[in-house]
Amino acid sequence: MSQCVDGIKHLCTSVLGCFDLDLYKQSGGLGDPELLARDTVFSVSEIEALYELFKKISSAVIDDGLINKEEFQLALFKTNKKESLFADRVFDLFDTKHNGILGFEEFARALSVFHPNAPIDDKIHFSFQLYDLKQQGFIERQEVKQMVVATLAESGMNLKDTVIEDIIDKTFEEADTKHDGKIDKEEWRSLVLRHPSLLKNMTLQYLKDITTTFPSFVFHSQVEDT
């Protein structure tokens, strides 16, 4: 998760990317910031400032108003590796329309879960989905191992397989209270509530300061925060 957090922070300063999506021109733009503000924890001002960030990323190569996986990986993880399980998983969770590209609404709604004011249950749900690779509603041992290995690879760490297996053993020993060889949503929630530090990387304090980071919206804002 630390790789995800570092990458999201890097979004504020990185506008790298290389792709061509001429067939998917988007004209919606910012849309209704008040509606997005009601549906997320962002204020209207934060939504408009977040849109400035989105435009910088999505127009890095062509001004198409969209972000694809390659551009997302370059901005988020500073890598253009074709195979990155961790980066792919994070992108897939952002890409709620499952069309291989991100529009602003998806971008804003996904980042909302990392806001300091986001409900803890939203953070727990997102972190659960991150490990539920097969989307079966529970986490299997192999899925945990795949994500651990992928995360270590992204951070440049190399642990012996025996050490990794030991980490997984201890995780399941505590989390799998039903002793069925898997971790369901209820068990994951209980584990996280016992160990809140597991969610420490699900909160990005800088999102509260997004209007300071990208203040240009101030000059053309159409609505006021309530």
Curated annotation (Swiss-Prot):
Subcellular localization, as worded in the UniProt entry: Vacuole membrane
Pfam family, one: EF-hand_5
Domain EF-hand: 36-81, 82-117, 119-154, 163-198
Effect of residue 106 to A: No effect on binding to CIPK14
Keyword flag Lipid metabolism: no
Induction description: By light.
Entry-linked InterPro entries: CNBL1-10 (IPR045198), EF-hand-dom_pair (IPR011992), EF_hand_dom (IPR002048)
Family annotation (PROSITE patterns): EF_HAND_2
Result when mutating residue 3 to E: No effect on tonoplast targeting
Any one GO MF annotation of this record: calcium ion binding
Effect the entry attributes to changing residue 216 to D: Increased interaction with CIPK11
Site (Involved in dimerization): 155
In-chain residues carrying the UniProt-annotated modification Phosphoserine: 216
Effect caused by changing residue 4 to S: Loss of tonoplast targeting. Loss of tonoplast targeting
Family: Belongs to the calcineurin regulatory subunit family.
Domain comment in the entry: EF-hands 1 and 4 have been shown to bind calcium. It is not known if EF-hands 2 and 3 are capable of calcium-binding. The N-terminal 22 amino acids are necessary and sufficient for vacuolar membrane targeting.
Subunit structure, as described in the record: Homodimer. Part of a K(+)-channel calcium-sensing kinase/phosphatase complex composed by a calcium sensor CBL (CBL1, CBL2, CBL3 or CBL9), a kinase CIPK (CIPK6, CIPK16 or CIPK23), a phosphatase PP2C (AIP1) and a K(+)-channel (AKT1). Interacts with PP2CA, CIPK1, CIPK2, CIPK4, CIPK6, CIPK7, CIPK9, CIPK11, CIPK12, CIPK13, CIPK14/SR1, CIPK16, CIPK23, and CIPK24.
Miscellaneous comment in the UniProt entry for this protein: Blockage of vesicle trafficking by Brefeldin-A does not affect S-acylation and vacuolar membrane targeting of CBL2.
Name of the protein in its database record: Calcineurin B-like protein 2
Organism, scientific name: Arabidopsis thaliana (Mouse-ear cress)
Source species taxonomy: Eukaryota, Viridiplantae, Streptophyta, Embryophyta, Tracheophyta
Gene name, Swiss-Prot/TrEMBL: CBL2
